[in-house]
């Protein structure tokens, strides 16, 4: 516990906050090139094959990024846009690939939350399937 005189002389030191996505270097997104596209399994208790890509960013840092949505067209040497945001059940995955930008296609046949997956608006002439009125 400092004395009042010590506080007058030195003041309090402010702790610097640590960023959750250091490879972005305070940028909202960064461009990168896929070096490897593969699937990995999540931590317990979940079970799946999650699609991830190893990406070398424009600042020469290599990170692991998650590919959201169903199906993708990414392969080695694809140019992608990376944003922050971790995947809770994949250790070491702290970035997401932005769908619908650069070489990444949007999710096909996506009706809801389209902006998050880079999907275009469906054509007006085609009626949307009604929820809950399927075959029984």
UniProtKB/Swiss-Prot annotation:
CDD domains: Ribosomal_S12. Residues 101-136 are annotated as: Disordered. The modification 3-methylthioaspartic acid is found at residue 89. Keywords: Methylation, Ribonucleoprotein, Ribosomal protein, RNA-binding, rRNA-binding, tRNA-binding. The keyword Hydrolase does not apply. GO terms for molecular function: rRNA binding; structural constituent of ribosome; tRNA binding. GO terms for cellular component: small ribosomal subunit. Pfam families: Ribosom_S12_S23. SUPFAM superfamilies: Nucleic acid-binding proteins. The keyword Nuclease does not apply. One of its GO terms (biological process) is translation. It comes from the Bacteria. Belongs to the universal ribosomal protein uS12 family. Part of the 30S ribosomal subunit. Contacts proteins S8 and S17. May interact with IF1 in the 30S initiation complex. With S4 and S5 plays an important role in translational accuracy. Interacts with and stabilizes bases of the 16S rRNA that are involved in tRNA selection in the A site and with the mRNA backbone. Located at the interface of the 30S and 50S subunits, it traverses the body of the 30S subunit contacting proteins on the other side and probably holding the rRNA structure together. The combined cluster of proteins S8, S12 and S17 appears to hold together the shoulder and platform of the 30S subunit. This is Small ribosomal subunit protein uS12. It comes from Pelodictyon phaeoclathratiforme (strain DSM 5477 / BU-1).
């Amino acid at each position: 516990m400092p004395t009042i005189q010590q506080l007058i002389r030195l003041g309090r030191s402010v702790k610097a906050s640590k960023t959750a996505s250091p490879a972005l270097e305070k940028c909202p997104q960064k461009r990168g090139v896929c070096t490897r596209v593969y699937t990995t399994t999540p931590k317990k208790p979940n079970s799946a094959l999650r699609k991830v890509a190893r990406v070398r960013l424009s600042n020469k840092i290599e990170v692991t990024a998650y590919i959201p949505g169903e199906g993708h067209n990414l392969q080695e040497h694809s140019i992608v846009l990376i944003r922050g945001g971790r995947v809770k059940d994949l250790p070491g995955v702290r970035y997401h690939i932005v769908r619908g930008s650069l070489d990444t296609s949007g999710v096909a046949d996506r009706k809801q939350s389209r902006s998050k997956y880079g999907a275009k608006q469906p054509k007006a002439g085609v009626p949307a399937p009604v929820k809950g009125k399927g075959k029984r």
